[in-house]
Structure formats: C-alpha cells, structure tokens
Amino acid sequence: MAGYYYRQLDREKRGVYDAMLAGMEALAPGIRVPRLDGPELSDIYLRLKLDTPLLFYVTGFQYRWMPGADHVELLPEYLFDKGKIRQHRQAVAARLDRLARPLQGKSDRDKELAIHAFILENVRYDKLKKPYSHEIIGPLTQGVGVCEGIAKTVKALCDAVQLPCIVALSEAAPERGVKYRHTWNVITVDGQRYHLDATFDNSLQRGTLRYDYFNLDDRHIFRDHETLVLPLPPCTADKGYYYRPLSFTKPEDVENRARQALRKKQPHFVFHWRGGGLNREILTDLLNRCAAAAAERGKCVSCSVNTAQAVVQLDFTDAPAGDPLLVQQPDEGNEL
C-alpha cells in the first residue's frame, strides 16, 4: 500500500516520488525526473524517506540540469558501496523476518507491545549520533539509534506485521532547548490512531519498561512535542493508553495500589496521575503516603516523575536513595 506521505502529493509529484523510489532501490547513480525546484524535490525526498525505512542506505541527494531542460538529474548519496548495500539489505530483511514471524496472527495490541518492547530492551540512544543511527540499521544491527532511526525501525517492524504506521516529524525549538527535529510514530491499533514515542519511553527506563508515550492522543503528545513539519491525521482516541487502568485521581488510591505492589514484592510501581496539576505538594503527599506503606514492610521508597505526562514511578528498595524525588526529562539527547 502506498505510504501516507505519498498519498498527500499531487499526480506530478507522485511521479517524481515513484522515480526516486525506483532509482534508489536499483542503486542508480542518477535518476531523471521532471524539473521541479530544490525545495519541492527536498520535500518529496523527505516524504519518501519517512514512508520507506528500507531505504536506509540513502542519505541525501544532489541534482543538476541543463538550461532550458524540462527535467533534472538526481544524484543520490549512498551510505555504502553497492556490494555493502546488498549485504546490509539481506541482513536487515532477515532480521525483520525473524522479529515479525512470531507476531503473525497476534492482535494489533500485542504486535504493538512487542515492537515497543523490542526497542526498549535492545536499543540504546546513540549520543554520538553516528550516520547509521539515523536509519534502521542502527537499531536492528548495532543496537543503537537516535529518534529518527528508532521511529523508522518501529515503522519497518509495523510494516512487516501489517500494522498501519506513520513516522511523525516535528520541528526543532532552540528557544525551548530542543536543538533537533524529533521523530516518533502514529500507529493504527484496532481501527484507532495513536501516538507512540519509543525513543522517549526508552530514555525514561529505570529498572522497568516505561509506557508514558504508548498510545497518546493529540492533546497529550503535544504537551512536550513540538509543531509538526508535515501534517498528520488526527489522533483523538484515548482508550488504548497503556496506563489508563493505572490512572488515579485520589492519593488514597495510589497508596492502596502501592500497598498491593509491596505485598507482591514488586520492586517498581508506575502510575498516571490525573487528579489535577502534579506539583511538588501533591508529589510530596503521594511520596509520604507510599513511604509509610513501604516502611511497614521494611522498605524505602523513591520516585521519578515525568511531569509533562504526569507519570510517576515508585521504586521500593532496602536502603534509602540519595534523592527520593527525581524529575525526569525524556530524550536527553535531543536537548541543548
């Protein structure tokens, strides 16, 4: 099926997109396309790369034309020579097949959970931002990636298990400390579209998988995500949010669930707070209640909080932590 960004183009630009795709898949040194200006060609190329994560070996292009000609010649820039590209394509295809095969026949939700878990359990953020970390070969073959490579990997895995997926792209905002553009995904699960940011969840892990950005609607994702570069379809559903069953409005409910976790000897308890602004006063009250419950069982408690998404992780330990309250900032690699 044609990619989401392809479907937003007019007929002429679709023709350029198709020619780019065919030429790059064939590893052509030059690709002839109808003459458009540079920004238009760059926009089509961006859409192609977001739609097609398997073009991991293409890093950009230049172009040239003759005066008066009705076409231009694109000159793709490849990350490797042809022999290496073919080797990497085979390795990536085999890796995707191994990961996708056990998910065939599973529910949409189970597929999404497995893909999310793969990223969190197998990929670390590459603060050096190597070229391959921006593409799927970083997460799939090296175990490292930046947000772009991670989001493209999520899409490649979703494509492999027939789960509709878009790579979302937002602007940088240097005035707010966001130095780079950011990428994540929009996934259709059981007929409903949701935002999924595996990079942000990956950056929040402290001994347990996190799902702060698992199936958010537009209202919640844009609390800490910037303006989109390319428009996305609306995401208005909230029933798929991972922490929905663990979303509380009363401190006593948090305390009761913390006691359950302690009885079950669980080292961590993560929940969502929707009882008003998650300020220091409320956090202190929640932490004091849970600390008293932990002390009854000879345990200490500390917490880390994602204030933008109002998600709190409680950690139960035998010895007190240095700082009982940690305010987390997701995706530290994206900050100035």
Where are these regions (language model features)?
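Metal-dependent nuclease catalytic core centered on acidic motifs
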Residues: Y213-V301
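Hydrophobic/aromatic-rich core segments of domains that either
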Residues: G149-H220
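Secondary-structure boundary elements
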Residues: Y78-P139
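Short, solvent-exposed positions on alpha-helices
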Residues: R109-L113, E148, Y194
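Linear, non-domain "peripheral" regions
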Residues: M1-R95, L262-R263, V270-F271, G277-L336
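A short, highly charged nucleic-acid-interacting micro-segment common to nuclease
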Residues: I136-I150
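Alpha-helix capping and helix-loop boundary segments enriched in small/acidic/polar residues
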Residues: V16, M20, T141-G145, P174
